[in-house]
């Protein structure tokens, strides 16, 4: 699988996981309508399917996705909850993304 397609899968996986979780959070914690929860649960179901479209093995895909999840979570918090990441958040994210990239995209036999 090419890197661009793989990154797209990670992007949409992140949207489904964080967006779905956020909608369920709004329903449970902020009293939003059950419609929020239903949409959230649907997105979380897609989150369970999308990683399986990657060609790498389960452990590698989920390990690398962990890095993507970190950046998506920080960006979501910044743009949706209006809590900007600080310099340590960015440094930690950079370190994690380097590791995730090595896990997912290092040339192997």
Swiss-Prot record:
Gene Ontology terms: cellular component: plasma membrane
Keywords of this entry: Cell inner membrane, Cell membrane, Membrane, Transmembrane, Transmembrane helix
Recorded topology in the membrane: Multi-pass membrane protein
Alphabetical list of InterPro entries matching this protein: UPF0060
Domain of life according to the entry: Bacteria
Pfam families associated with the record: UPF0060
Signal peptide residue numbers: none
Transmembrane segments: 7-27, 36-56, 58-78, 87-107
Places the protein is found: Cell inner membrane
Main location: membrane
Family, similarity comment: Belongs to the UPF0060 family.
Full protein name: UPF0060 membrane protein PCC8801_1733
């Amino acid at each position: 699988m090419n890197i661009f397609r793989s990154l797209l899968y990670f992007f949409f996986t992140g949207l489904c996981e964080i967006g779905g979780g956020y909608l369920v959070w709004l329903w449970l914690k902020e009293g939003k309508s059950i419609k929020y929860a239903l949409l959230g649960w649907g997105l979380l179901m897609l989150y369970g399917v999308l990683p399986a479209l990657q060609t790498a093995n389960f452990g590698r895909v989920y390990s690398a996705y962990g890095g993507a999840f970190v950046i998506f979570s920080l960006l979501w918090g910044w743009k949706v909850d209006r809590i900007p990441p600080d310099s340590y958040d960015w440094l930690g994210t950079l370190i994690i993304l380097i590791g995730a990239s090595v896990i997912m995209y290092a040339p192997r036999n």
